[in-house]
Design a protein with these regions (language model features):
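Signature of long, low-cysteine stretches enriched in small and polar/charged residues
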Residues: 105-157, 161, 198-206, 210-217
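Post-signal peptide N-terminal segment of mature Sec-exported envelope proteins
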Residues: 25-47
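Secretory pathway targeting signatures of secreted, lumenal, and periplasmic proteins
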Residues: 46-103
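Surface-exposed amphipathic alpha-helical segments
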Residues: 151-226
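Sec-dependent signal peptide recognition
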Residues: 2-10
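Sec/Tat-exported extracytoplasmic proteins
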Residues: 63, 105-109, 174-178
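Bacterial signal peptide processing site
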Residues: 18-21
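C-terminal motif of bacterial Sec signal peptides marking the signal peptidase cleavage site
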Residues: 13-16
Length: 226
């Protein structure tokens, strides 16, 4: 009898402790609001040719290229990507080209989305969009977009609030070296960083291959001009 009671109590505890999707979404909204107003006390500043950014103490860096960096937050790989096309478009011309990940996210149906604005290190307004898309099983594609940057990760839904908090904190510290971007990319007929981004994205998580396949199909249907 005692054993049965113990089992019943355990079931009740486990049932009571389960996290509902509604609760997760509430936690995500709270995390984004907290990150938008948090003091920017950063551990280290990292300077690249095209941009500068700061990392919180708990976030690490795995590898990087000219336009992308893989960060590590809560034992999860996070891709931080500089949107070269947006930088060039603001300076020279409006382009029909769209960063592949941005285009894919825009066409998909999110299970969570929040659009708002915060302030960056220079106290300038920084609009952002946080989106979560279902991938497969318990995995979701978590993304945060600003004017010039796109952060993305593939992880369990329950990690979304923690990852988006770090993404937004870092996004608030980013500064683009526009002159360097123009010097490197404005005279190129083809910008190969899109392919480079997808190659790095493939290293994020086991489910990233499925997302890349979905992006490739989407791009092949004419949604993105390469």
């Amino acid at each position: 009898m005692k054993q049965i009671l113990k089992i019943m109590v355990l079931v009740l505890v486990l049932t009571g402790c389960s996290v509902k999707p509604v609760d997760i979404k509430t936690n995500i909204t709270v995390a984004l609001d907290d990150a938008a107003t948090a003091d920017l006390i950063m551990n280290q500043g990292l300077r690249k040719a095209n941009y500068v950014y700061y990392l919180p103490p708990a976030v690490g860096r795995k590898e990087s290229s000219q336009s992308s960096t893989i960060l590590v937050s809560h034992n999860t790989n996070v891709l931080m990507n500089l949107d070269i096309v947006s930088v060039l478009s603001d300076r020279f011309y409006k382009s029909d080209k769209i960063e592949l990940l941005r285009a894919f996210i825009a066409k998909a149906t999110p299970i969570y989305k929040k659009e708002a604005a915060t302030f960056d290190l220079d106290h300038k307004s920084l609009p952002y969009s946080a989106t979560i898309l279902s991938v497969e099983g318990n995995s979701v594609l978590i993304s945060l977009q600003t004017r010039y940057f796109l952060f993305s990760a593939i992880a369990p839904f329950t990690l979304a609030s923690d990852l988006l908090y770090d993404m937004l904190l870092i996004a608030r510290t980013c500064r683009v070296n526009e002159e360097e971007v123009i010097l490197r990319y404005s005279n190129r007929e083809t910008i190969n960083y899109q392919k480079e981004t997808l190659e790095i994205f493939s290293q994020l998580a086991p489910d990233s291959g499925k997302v890349i396949d979905m992006i490739s199909v989407d791009a092949g249907q004419g949604g993105v001009e390469e």
